[in-house]
Structures are given as structure tokens and as C-alpha cells.
Design a protein with these regions (language model features):
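A small/polar active-site loop signature that marks catalytic segments
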Residues: 1-103
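C-terminal soluble interaction/assembly domains
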Residues: 68-203
């Protein structure tokens, strides 16, 4: 017989997702993923079971994603067991690119930050989300080349052996280990930027 006293409506999911991607908020990613799982299967309560439900939906809705390599232990990716291949992520981008979102029927790039190229004269526009850990760097989204050609892309740079060594190193928070890891990240970012600028100029 209880009656509600007050209710608070959240912002539209599209707006929440924009902030999530802008600030890389892992808690928001977990909560959105769990809410999605509960919508698909009421009663889901844990992050692991929620990730399994969403992965099952992906397998049915976008079979290429799971077929090409999508193993998620949770919804944020902050787990050593999580593995996603470039091909699987590209399949997800293609699915997103074929749809429109929100009341304004916007393309999926409305979710992503527009990034400028570091060098002058590269041309083009970049809408992408990056992910960074020591010995792992990725970026995915859409590149609009200087010629006006839209390209979906996924770039991943990973050193699995160095990452495993870093995780198993008791001194990983000490300066020498951190310095080496940061050097690797700088090289990965430079390579990533060079590839994207080359595509922007030549394709």
C-alpha cells in the first residue's frame, strides 16, 4: 500500500553516454551495462552475470562481434580476462554506423569527441575514443579524410609480454618501471597519430 513520495528522472541515455565516453568513467560504464543486462534479463545482479547477458545479446544481434573475438568479464573492460580483437570492435562500429540515435536521429559520432590532428595540414576530422594502459593503447571511431571519405577504423598497439611482466612486477609503481612503461606509451601514441594522419592525407 506504499505510495511513491518523489521520483527523479535521469537525463537521456544518449547524454549520459556522451559524458561516459568523454571522461572515461568506468563506474558509469558498469552501471549502464548492468542496467542494460537487467532490461534484457530481469533479476541480473552481478557485473559478471550482466556482462554475460550483454555478450549473449551481442552474439545474437551482431554475430560477427563474438565470432571475431569478444570476451568481456565485466562492462568497463577493467579486467585481465577481457579480450577484444580489432575485427570484433570494427564489426560493432559498423553496426553502430548503420543506425541513428536520439530524437534528432544523430549518427553515432555524436557520442564521440572530435579530435584535431597534431600536425598542421593533415586535414580531415577525427571522431574517436581511446583506451590506455601501460603496454596497451587503442583508438577506434570514424575518420573523415581530407578528401571527404568517411572511414571506420580500429587501431590497437599491445605488448602482451611486457604487460604481463608489468602486472607481475612487485616494483611496478617504482620510478624505473613507470618510466619504461611511459616511454612505451609515448611511442604507441606517436605511431597511432602518424597512421591516422597518413590516412587522413592520402585516402
Amino acid at each position: 500500500g506504499a505510495e511513491p513520495v518523489a521520483a527523479h528522472e535521469s537525463r537521456a541515455m544518449l547524454e549520459i553516454a556522451v559524458d561516459l565516453l568523454e571522461y572515461s568513467n568506468n563506474l558509469s560504464a558498469e552501471l549502464i551495462g548492468l542496467a542494460t543486462a537487467q532490461k534484457l534479463k530481469p533479476g541480473v545482479s552481478s557485473l559478471a552475470s550482466g556482462a554475460a547477458v550483454v555478450r549473449g545479446w551481442l552474439g545474437k544481434t551482431i554475430p560477427d562481434v563474438t565470432r571475431l573475438g569478444w570476451q568481456s568479464a565485466n562492462q568497463s573492460g577493467l579486467a585481465g580476462q577481457t579480450r577484444v580483437t580489432p575485427a570484433a570492435l570494427l564489426a560493432l562500429l559498423r553496426f553502430a554506423d548503420a543506425r541513428r540515435y536520439g530524437a534528432g536521429q544523430a549518427p553515432f559520432t555524436v557520442l564521440l569527441r572530435e579530435t584535431e590532428f597534431a600536425s598542421q595540414g593533415a586535414g580531415g576530422r577525427l571522431y574517436a575514443k581511446s583506451g590506455t594502459m601501460f603496454y596497451a593503447r587503442g583508438q577506434a571511431g570514424q575518420l573523415l579524410t581530407a578528401s571527404g571519405r568517411p572511414l571506420l577504423f580500429v587501431l590497437m598497439h599491445t605488448d602482451f609480454a611486457s604487460r604481463a611482466g608489468y602486472e607481475g612486477n612487485a616494483a611496478r609503481y617504482k620510478a624505473p618501471v613507470q618510466i619504461r612503461a611511459n616511454r612505451w606509451l609515448r611511442r604507441a601514441r606517436v605511431a597511432e597519430q602518424a597512421i591516422l594522419e597518413y590516412w587522413a592525407k592520402t585516402l
